[in-house]
Amino acid sequence: MPQLNPHPWFAILVFSWIFFLVILPKKVMTHLFNNNPTAKSAEKPKPEPWNWPWT
C-alpha cells in the first residue's frame, strides 16, 4: 500500500509546517504593523481660512 510509505509525503508535510510556522508569520506581521504612529507636536497648527475664488 503506497499511502503507508511516509517517504514521499513526509518531507512535504514537514516543509509546509516550517513555512507556516516560520516564514509566513514574518510576512504577515510586516503587512499588519507597517504604519508606525508618530508623536504629534504639542503645538496645534492654526487653521487657514478657505480662499474661495468666486466670491
From Swiss-Prot:
Keywords noted in UniProt: ATP synthesis, CF(0), Hydrogen ion transport, Ion transport, Membrane, Mitochondrion, Transmembrane, Transmembrane helix, Transport
Subcellular location(s) per record: Mitochondrion membrane
TM region(s), chain numbering: 6-26
InterPro entries for the chain: ATP8_metazoa, ATPase_protein_8
Gene Ontology CC terms: mitochondrial membrane; proton-transporting ATP synthase complex
Keyword Ion transport: yes
GO biological process: proton motive force-driven ATP synthesis
Main location: mitochondrion
Subunit organization: F-type ATPases have 2 components, CF(1) - the catalytic core - and CF(0) - the membrane proton channel.
Role played: Mitochondrial membrane ATP synthase (F(1)F(0) ATP synthase or Complex V) produces ATP from ADP in the presence of a proton gradient across the membrane which is generated by electron transport complexes of the respiratory chain. F-type ATPases consist of two structural domains, F(1) - containing the extramembraneous catalytic core and F(0) - containing the membrane proton channel, linked together by a central stalk and a peripheral stalk. During catalysis, ATP synthesis in the catalytic domain of F(1) is coupled via a rotary mechanism of the central stalk subunits to proton translocation.
PANTHER family linked to this entry: ATP SYNTHASE PROTEIN 8
Family the UniProt entry places it in: Belongs to the ATPase protein 8 family.
Protein name: ATP synthase protein 8
Species name: Squalus acanthias (Spiny dogfish)
Gene: MT-ATP8
